[in-house]
Amino acid sequence: YDSCPELIEKLKGMGIIVIADIDDYWLPTKEHPIHQLIMQNKLHEKIVKNLKAASYVMTTTEIFANEIRKFNKNVVVFPNAIDPNESQFKEPTLPSDKIRVGWLGGSSHLHDLKLIDGTISKLSPLQDKLQYYVCGFDTRGTVTEINKQTGEKTQRPIKPEETVWLKYEKIFTNDYKIITPKYKEFLEKFEDKEYFGSENENYVRVWTKPVNSYAKNYSKFDISLAPIQDHVFNRMKSQLKVIEAGFYKKALIASNVGPYTIDLKHALNQGQFTDGNALLVDNARNHSDWAKNIKKLVENPNMIVDLGERLYETVKDKYDLNQVTKTRSEFYKSLIK
């Protein structure tokens, strides 16, 4: 990192165009697992120096591009995109008597998911009609322990019961109140196995999948949730959750924040459905509207299908990898004319 800006200047001096590509803000908030690591090594400062030195910077949204332009005016936007012919985006959704609500993500989203804590409890009267999915469950990782006498730091693999995914699971199961004791006993074994009868449970744990097949998990549910806290790191994120849900024709309930404001239009006006393509939750309404929006869709299941179709129409051409790659290729060609 330290020598990168100097190297970039040397390359530019030789007539070589240097392009930096970035899709995450350089300084995550304090609750993020890697915040301390970045601060200790001043990685955020080094990233900004590289962005300043680059001939061009590529990123995924105009929101993030405007932030980068504070350091480098030559910023171009190429959004995240999907190959619609890739098998992981063609998995069929099987029918169910229940309306399935799902979340799919990684291990750094505890504070985002806290926005919906209490939602499952509020939906208790509708529980016989609902089933929840958490996709990406993982017990891998390490924990750093510090010897109080010597200050020595040692790393060890986390124990299964230490995984942050258990905290996710407690949010989606109302602290395991909505599942049977027998199923809870199975979950506590932390075995990546099918549970016979899981289709009858109110919650399903879905283990992590490789990057080339994780999106198949969208086929498991009908309504996709995308809660994010309103802070600079999240505002600079891409709208990938919108794109993925759209290609799978899922009804989406999302935070009315940053990347989700790019393509989404709220589909409710004074309790009546309008021409929007998703349901958005304002910051001031996090305490109530996640449950209200799910309830609205449970009571109007035809809107689950309609919103999924509308979102698909929004994303299917704009975020088709073939089109985005063509545009990117044209940009590269323009640099060497």
Where are these regions (language model features)?
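A short, well-ordered alpha-helix in the C-terminal region of glycosyltransferases
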Residues: 296, 303-318, 327-330
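Active-site proximal beta-strand in glycosyltransferases
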Residues: 11-29
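Nucleotide-sugar-dependent
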Residues: 207-246, 253-266
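Conserved catalytic-core segment of nucleotide-activated headgroup transferases in glycan assembly
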Residues: 83-89, 94-219
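Membrane-proximal helix-turn-helix segments that form the acceptor-binding/catalytic region
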Residues: 13, 37-56
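An aromatic- and histidine-rich active-site surface loop
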Residues: 1-14, 113-115, 244
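Donor nucleotide-sugar binding/catalytic pocket of nucleotide-sugar-dependent glycosyltransferases
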Residues: 52-90
